[in-house]
Swiss-Prot record:
Gene Ontology CC: one annotated term: virion membrane
Quaternary structure (record): Homomultimer. Interacts with nucleoprotein and with the cytoplasmic domain of glycoprotein. Interacts with host ATP6V1A; this interaction plays an important role in virion uncoating after viral entry.
Entry annotated with the keyword Phosphoprotein: yes
Record protein name field: Matrix protein
Signal peptide: none
Gene giving rise to this polypeptide: M
Additional note from the record: The avirulent strain Ni-CE does not block the formation of stress granules.
Comment block on domains: Late-budding domains (L domains) are short sequence motifs essential for viral particle budding. They recruit proteins of the host ESCRT machinery (Endosomal Sorting Complex Required for Transport) or ESCRT-associated proteins. Matrix protein contains one L domain: a PPXY motif which potentially interacts with the WW domain 3 of NEDD4 E3 ubiquitin ligase (Potential).
Start and end residues of each stretch annotated as Essential for glycoprotein binding: 115-151
UniProt GO BP: viral budding via host ESCRT complex
């Protein structure tokens, strides 16, 4: 197991030294470091900056030659550099992408469409999250192309404040979602007031 971790670490170090995010993705897609342990975010009642948001998320994957999550993960590793929206929404967009892509796709022409409709609870640090009553929306298209492959991602996320009781925003499993979150470097920390909760810092 230690040998595997060293191999993965060395591979990750090599990836970070690559000058261009459009370089070819690694062939060993099964090698990845699991992200920090994600645990359910419990119900909070006394938090002034805790708000429930109804989330609509849609991710379209377009590729004439099919696609693999190896390619998607390669694209999303550089998400911080290519994100074009409101920075207060970047953490939420990352989570929605991960959750949406881990669900069941629906064919739509040449596209595969993943949709997420779920009530999520977030806590932002330093008042960086949405303002009271604010609605956030983000749409973006990301493409990856070389001589052999073309993959396009169309992302649309809408967050509206609502008063429905939410459940969790993260899943403590070694799932495809966690792989995507790990690739996108989602910033979290354990709550000082509740050891069973992870807080979103962005």
């Amino acid at each position: 197991m230690n040998i595997l971790r060293k191999i993965v670490k060395n591979r990750k170090d090599e990836d970070t030294q690559k000058p261009s995010p459009a370089s070819a993705p690694p062939d060993d897609d099964d090698l990845w470091l699991p992200p920090p342990e994600y645990v359910p975010l419990k119900e909070f009642t006394s938090k002034k900056n805790m708000r429930n948001f109804c989330i609509n998320g849609e991710v379209k994957v377009c590729s004439p030659n099919g696609y693999s999550f190896r390619i998607l993960r390669h694209i999303l590793r550089s998400f911080d550099e290519i994100y074009s929206g409101n920075h207060r929404m970047i953490g939420l967009v990352k989570v929605v992408i991960g959750l949406a892509l881990s669900g069941a796709p629906v064919p739509e022409g040449m596209n595969w469409v993943y949709k997420l409709r779920r009530t999520l609870i977030f806590q932002w640090a330093d008042s960086r999250g949405p303002l009271e009553g604010e609605e956030l929306e983000h749409s973006q298209e990301i493409t990856w192309d070389d001589d052999t492959e073309f993959v396009g991602l169309q992302i649309r996320v809408i967050a509206r404040q609502c008063h429905i009781q939410g459940r969790i925003w993260c899943i403590n499993t070694n799932s495809r979602t966690c792989q995507l979150w790990s690739d996108m470097s989602l910033k979290t920390q354990m709550s000082e007031e509740d050891k069973d909760s992870s807080l979103l810092l962005e």
